[in-house]
Amino acid sequence: MLKVRTDLDVEFLAFELYELEVTEPREDFELEIARATQAVRAGTFGDIGRARALYRRFGTDPTRTRPSNEALLRRLKKGNALPRVNSLVDVANALSVQLQVPVGLYDLEKARGDELTIRLGTEGEGYSGIGKEHVNVGGRLCVADSVGPCGNPSADSARTMITTETERAAWIYFLPVTDDDIDRTAELVAVFGRGLVRMA
């Protein structure tokens, strides 16, 4: 079973997703995309300040390195659509926008070891990002496995990215969410990721 630990003063929620059947983007997810878009138009999304405060607490300027939730929010505010990647990543992006909480997703068959750690990156640490050449995490909040960092609240790594081959994954909310949000996460993962969810 997945274990996620930290020695930092951060509140997070982690889930292990298993028996997944990730597919290409699904047409029947358009309702959730519309819900996220409507939340932005109506201003009913979560508190954008929570993720910014998390970054500032660890010395990162959130106006220069934006949390993923805010980057997605800004995309929608500019009239652009949410990126469609696959059935599981699409769920994470939609919930991240609505809740305004950064979400990390990691393929556990690609991660090394039985444990993920939320920590500060050391000087010079980084990884190849998804669609990015290099992501520097030195001095920044990151997620690491036994060989090094594989994600952070702004951008995950290509090494542990979710694909249609993913059968087991870690889902991390980098801020607390409500019990209703947890239930909704499990529901959407079951419907669109065709998988099961347990707390890590």
Where in this protein do the model-derived segments appear?
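Charge-biased, low-complexity intrinsically disordered regions
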Residues: 1-200
